[in-house]
A protein has these predicted regions:
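Glycine-rich phosphate-binding loop and adjoining beta1-alpha1-beta2 segment
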Residues: 27-67
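Conserved Rossmann-fold NAD(P)-dependent oxidoreductase catalytic core, especially the SDR/UDP-sugar
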Residues: 86, 94, 98-99, 106-156
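Active-site Tyr-X1-5-Lys
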Residues: 149-169
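NAD(P)H-binding glycine-rich loop region in Rossmannoid oxidoreductase-like domains
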Residues: 50, 54, 58-106, 118
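N-terminal Rossmann NAD(P)H-binding glycine-rich loop of SDR-like oxidoreductase domains
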Residues: 1-25
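Short, well-ordered alpha-helices that flank and scaffold nucleotide-derived cofactor binding pockets
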Residues: 18-22, 113-116, 167
Length: 169
């Protein structure tokens, strides 16, 4: 099984890759920013011997096609990616609205378009309870449109990000 992950260097992503690598037939391709390349060796050490089944792909989810070349797209295309898992996001409540929109909204649009371009199998999004805004009480999956008080940029961008995936995937 082949996986493509955004956010693999983050808290959840590092642990998810570890779990996926416990599956003997798994290969994990992960998007990494160029400035994060020094982190690759640390990740490989964390993942141990199974790290030889991981493949860093330098790119940027804020760019169309994730900033990948035609050659990279061709290499990943054709159903070789069974699961695309989108974890990457700005989760800093103090980050500017502009950067949150760029990463959380436009980044998600770009990842969805990328998944379509490479003919990925299943698309998985790790969202946030913030997508509910300040809704009081129990908020179920089927209540997405009932989110309230999305004025805070993080809440709004996570809500819009999840909406993109709900509509397009």
């Amino acid at each position: 099984m082949n996986y493509f992950i955004t956010g693999a260097s983050g808290f959840i992503g590092r642990r998810l890759v570890e779990k996926l690598l416990q599956r003997q037939d798994s290969h994990v391709y992960y998007l990494i920013l160029e400035r994060e390349l020094p982190m690759v060796e640390q990740l490989r050490q964390r993942w141990g011997n199974a790290a030889n089944r991981t493949f860093p792909i330098v790119g940027d989810l804020t760019q169309p096609r994730l900033g990948l070349s035609d050659a990279d797209l061709a290499w990943l295309k054709g159903g070789s990616i069974h699961h695309l898992i989108h974890l990457a996001a700005i989760y800093d409540l103090n980050a500017s609205a502009e950067i949150q929109e760029q990463v959380n909204i436009e980044g998600t649009r770009n990842v969805v378009a990328f998944a379509e371009a490479i003919e990925a199998g299943c698309f998985h999004l790790t969202s946030s309870i913030a997508a509910a805004g300040l809704y009081e009480g129990v908020f179920r999956e089927d209540m997405f449109e009932e989110a309230e008080n999305l004025d805070q940029p993080y809440y709004r961008t996570k809500h819009e990000s999840e909406g993109i995936v709900r509509r397009e995937c």
